[in-house]
């Protein structure tokens, strides 16, 4: 199999034209870190390619007042319980800090920022391409989430609507909606939390 002979860190790895390992995880959020934890436990060589400049995944782009809707102990990643927070439901800042500490605690080999262009099958291996850089692995795990490609449904007469239509992925705070009539579409956690705020 392929093995990384030394720990990969930022610029050093980015300067390498090609890196080979057993598994490449694309994405650096909670799913990627959880996967990395179990790969490390099984001593399976891997690297994480994350397009963000720092740890935190989609939480880096969430609205300012976002909180977890469950207590920290229920929202922990494998191997390390999220430390107690000031309030029962951790804030965006507290979750990002936890994800940063989690990465550091387990010394995951993360290269960032790397925007993956495409993945191609090359017989027994997969090649992962980011610009002129290429990595090869036996397996590739997509942990990119949905934040970067939010879905906004179309509806009849949409082109005539004069108001603002905004996906929760682009919501920051309630200021834009002050003294306006607002309709929230969707009953998920994002919709419920934003509704309570606007």
Where in the sequence are the language-model features?
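Nucleotide donor/acceptor-binding cores
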Residues: 21, 44, 138-139, 179-182
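Short glycine-/acidic-enriched loop or helix-start segments at secondary-structure transitions
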Residues: 35, 58, 121, 151-153, ...
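Glycine-rich dinucleotide-binding loop and its adjacent helix/turn
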Residues: 85, 91-94, 144-198
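Feature captures the FAD/FMN-dependent oxidoreductase FAD-binding
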Residues: 91-148
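N-terminal Rossmann-like FAD-binding beta1-loop-alpha1 element of flavoenzymes
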Residues: 20-48, 192-198
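Extreme N-terminal leader/targeting segments of oxidoreductases
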Residues: 1-23, 148-169
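Residues in the short beta-alpha loop(s) of Rossmann-like NAD(P)-binding domains
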Residues: 52
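Glycine-rich active-site loop/strand segments that organize a redox cofactor
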Residues: 57-96
């Amino acid at each position: 199999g392929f093995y990384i002979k030394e720990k990969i860190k930022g610029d050093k790895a980015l300067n390498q034209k090609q890196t080979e390992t057993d598994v490449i995880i694309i994405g650096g959020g909670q799913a990627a870190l959880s996967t990395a934890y179990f790969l490390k436990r099984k001593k399976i060589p891997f690297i994480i390619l994350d397009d963000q400049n720092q740890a935190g995944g989609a939480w880096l782009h969430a609205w300012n007042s976002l909180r977890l809707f469950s207590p920290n102990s229920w929202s922990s990643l494998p191997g390390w319980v999220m430390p107690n927070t000031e309030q029962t439901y951790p804030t965006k800042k507290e979750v990002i800090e936890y994800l940063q500490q989690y990465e550091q605690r387990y010394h995951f080999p993360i290269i960032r920022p790397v925007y993956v262009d495409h993945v191609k099958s090359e017989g027994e291996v997969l090649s992962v391409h980011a610009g002129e850089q290429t990595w090869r692995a036996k397996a590739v795990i997509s942990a990119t989430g949905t934040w970067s490609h939010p879905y906004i449904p179309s509806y009849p007469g949409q082109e005539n609507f004069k108001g603002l239509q905004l996906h929760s992925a682009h919501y920051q705070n309630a200021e834009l909606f002050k003294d306006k009539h607002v309709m929230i579409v969707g009953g998920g956690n994002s919709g419920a939390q934003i509704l309570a705020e606007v």
